[in-house]
Amino acid sequence: MSDSEYLTRAEAALAAIERALDDTDADIELERSGNVLTLEFENRTKIIVNLQPPMSEIWIAAKAGGFHFRFVDGEWRDTRSGTEFFAALSEYATQQAGEPVHFKA
């Protein structure tokens, strides 16, 4: 994948997260600084989602751990488990929010 393709796909993923948080009832604060999204929950825990252009990856740091995602067969997939990005982010956010939080592309 070219650098421009990566940036287009990765930016679309960040935009989808921003849209989902606009539509949720969960108390999650969102801050964006360049290629980094910080989601802060009511209990003061955070999830950090950041782009890693040199690796063509998106990384998530959550209470559950650190995870790397690459674009494979039309989806962002965890490089270790193969879990789809938005499913994983939904799971981590639900754990930290204490209520259902759903993200989708």
Swiss-Prot record:
Protein name as annotated: Iron-sulfur cluster assembly protein CyaY
SMART domains reported in the protein's UniProt record: Frataxin_Cyay (SM01219)
Listed PROSITE patterns: FRATAXIN_1, FRATAXIN_2
GO biological process: iron-sulfur cluster assembly
Assigned protein family: Belongs to the frataxin family.
Organism: Paraburkholderia phytofirmans (strain DSM 17436 / LMG 22146 / PsJN) (Burkholderia phytofirmans)
Signal peptide limits: none
Sorted UniProt keywords: Iron, Metal-binding
Function as written in the Swiss-Prot or TrEMBL entry: Involved in iron-sulfur (Fe-S) cluster assembly. May act as a regulator of Fe-S biogenesis.
A GO cellular component annotation in the UniProt record: cytosol
One annotated GO molecular function: ferric iron binding
Domain of life (superkingdom): Bacteria
Keyword Protein transport: no
Listed InterPro entries: CyaY, Frataxin/CyaY, Frataxin/CyaY_sf, Frataxin_CS
